[in-house]
Design a protein with these regions (language model features):
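Aromatic-patch recognition
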Residues: 1-123
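C-terminal partner/receptor-binding element of secreted or periplasmic proteins
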Residues: 115-152
Length: 152
């Protein structure tokens, strides 16, 4: 997402370069400009996020080893830049969840292992999550929202 402040250029620049997160009503957005997963950058945009406890979870495109292991990748037999572009385009519409550690500000992937930890106190939710057999943002989001609703 791109967030702007209308005609106020100085506020737009502030939102783009200095703001860590923006909350509008009940929606939270995290600025990905300075965030990295391992050595990969997310880009200069805002991602929709959820705050559960002290942790912030946001959805973004799969990066690095997450992209390589994602069910979003496809076997492309074309080589060179053209083949790379086709393979990368398959990931554009895919999303996975990442977690920002509040103590270190490090970004980690929210995969099956992490979701098993988070859902540990809810065996029925955990079993349902494992039956879905997907690390996509659509599936992960459903269970993170259940945890968020329980927190209230």
């Amino acid at each position: 997402y791109k967030i702007s402040a209308g005609p106020d250029d100085s506020m737009c620049k502030y939102l783009k370069s200095r703001c860590y997160a923006v909350q509008a009503d009940t929606s939270l957005y995290v600025n990905c400009k300075r965030l990295r997963y391992k050595k990969f950058r997310f880009g200069g945009w805002y991602a929709p996020a959820l705050r559960i406890g002290d942790h912030i979870y946001f959805s973004a495109i799969p990066l690095g080893s997450v992209a390589a292991g994602s069910d979003a990748t496809m076997d492309v037999m074309l080589g060179g830049q053209f083949g790379d572009a086709i393979a990368a385009s398959a990931l554009i519409s895919k999303r996975v969840y990442y977690e920002i550690d509040p103590e270190t500000n490090k970004v980690g992937f929210v995969g099956k292992e992490r979701m098993e930890e988070l859902l540990g106190g809810h065996p029925d939710w955990k079993a349902a999550y494992l039956n879905e057999n997907s690390e996509s943002a659509k599936v992960t989001d459903k269970y993170l929202r259940l945890l968020k609703a329980e927190e209230k």
